[in-house]
Design a protein with these regions (language model features):
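Beta-strand elements of repeat-based all-beta scaffolds
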Residues: 1-225
Length: 225
């Protein structure tokens, strides 16, 4: 659920002794005394530690943790986009959000929210960075989970679009990636093309229509030579 650093640091032996024959159960909580804004109870504080630094927090199953974000929750809430995958009503058993805290300012953190289709494929991620800027990525997947296309918007702290990126992938009948087209602000920037040998290993890669080209050879062990 979460990771944190405690000072003074304890030896592995001390930690094993402290946790021996103990069962810690954490659950969602609307209020708690430690780390406001985390969204979980906190029952595994180590004894004799006088300072704690929260590092990461993970959320699962649903999106009830978004209340933590207050007014920013509207930017992180799911929004459908035409031509891209739709989020399924249930995310049971899936990672739905992460918080990663700034090591220099423990009051700041980046948060990412994950949305999935009915097959468990990620179809949308919405991130607020430590700087306050946002990054939204939309994806369309095939039945095998391969990403057919994605579109990423980079927004400033006020929600204004600054840069957009789009990626389109093509696969062969075996599900191997054969081509990727990448564009910035709807202007084609570069493309990659891939070929494979009879064993399914990549044999060549070209960029920008062959402007840059690489071939791969393998020995009997399957290592690139």
């Amino acid at each position: 659920l979460y990771t944190y650093e405690a000072n003074p640091l304890r030896s592995p032996g001390d930690l094993r002794q402290y946790c021996k024959e103990k069962l810690f159960v954490e659950e969602r909580a609307d209020s708690y005394t430690a780390w406001p804004g985390m969204g979980y109870t906190l029952r595994i504080l180590l004894p004799a530690a006088n300072d704690y630094r929260l590092l990461t927090v993970n959320y699962y199953d649903d999106y009830s943790f978004l209340y933590i974000e207050g007014t920013a929750a509207s930017q992180l809430a799911y929004r459908s986009k035409e031509g891209y995958g739709a989020a399924y009503s249930s995310a049971k058993g899936l990672l739905t959000g992460t918080q990663v805290f700034d090591l220099t300012d423990r009051s700041k953190y980046a948060i990412t929210v994950y949305y999935y289709d009915e097959y468990g494929n990620p179809v949308q991620t919405r991130t607020r960075h430590v700087s306050g800027d946002y990054e939204m990525t939309y994806a369309q997947c095939d039945l095998s989970g391969n990403i057919l296309k994605s579109y990423t918007e980079h927004l400033d702290s006020r929600g204004r679009l600054s840069v957009s990126e789009s990626v389109e992938n093509t696969y062969d009948r075996s599900g191997r990636l054969t081509r990727t087209d990448y564009a910035v602000n709807d202007s084609l920037s570069t493309d990659w093309r891939y070929e494979y040998d009879e064993l399914g290993r990549i044999s060549s890669k070209s960029i920008d229509g062959g402007l840059t080209h690489a071939k791969y050879r393998y020995n009997l062990q399957g290592w690139i030579t």
